[in-house]
């Protein structure tokens, strides 16, 4: 049986500065990958699945040779899954976040960033 990708949006392996808030607790982190549908990042605390989070992504001002203005994207998401990273000195949890409330213009900004990143990665391979 052939493999079928279930993701609705393409994702890219980009480290984007990200602030995640759970109630009054805030975590500063970097994404490991990003799409219009969500992100994967590392958090220092365990967060239960389906916990609602506030996410602020600081999309970079440039990506390779492509120059774009720096943009912040704010949205709401939920934790889909979390896996403890085994070889860390301090607790660290790889956290998958699904964006549940994202303004259309912010989804477009992330989409443009993802496309530029994909283009940049393709150019590096050729």
Predicted segments with their positions:
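Residue-level recognition of beta-strand microenvironments
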Residues: 34, 46, 80-82, 102
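Short, charged beta-turn/beta-strand-edge "cap" motif at the junction between a beta-strand
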Residues: 46, 58-63
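Short coil-to-beta-strand transition motifs
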Residues: 13, 66-76
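C-terminal output/interaction extensions
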Residues: 86-126
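Short, conserved beta-turn/loop elements at beta-strand boundaries and strand-helix junctions
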Residues: 23, 36, 82-88
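N-terminal helix initiation/capping motif
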Residues: 1-34, 42-46, 111-126
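Short beta-strand-centered aromatic/proline hotspots
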Residues: 29-30, 75-82
């Amino acid at each position: 049986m052939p493999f079928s990708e279930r993701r609705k949006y393409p994702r890219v392996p980009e480290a984007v500065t990200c602030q995640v808030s759970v109630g009054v607790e805030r975590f500063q982190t970097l994404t490991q990958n990003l799409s219009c549908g969500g992100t994967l990042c590392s958090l220092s605390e365990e967060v239960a699945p389906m916990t609602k989070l506030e996410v602020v992504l600081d999309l970079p001002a440039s990506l390779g040779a492509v120059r774009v203005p720096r943009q912040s994207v704010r949205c709401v998401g939920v934790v889909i899954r979390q896996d403890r990273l085994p070889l860390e000195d301090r607790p660290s949890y790889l956290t998958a976040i699904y964006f549940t409330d994202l303004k259309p213009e912010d989804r477009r900004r992330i989409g443009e960033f993802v496309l530029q990143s994909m283009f940049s990665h393709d150019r590096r391979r050729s």
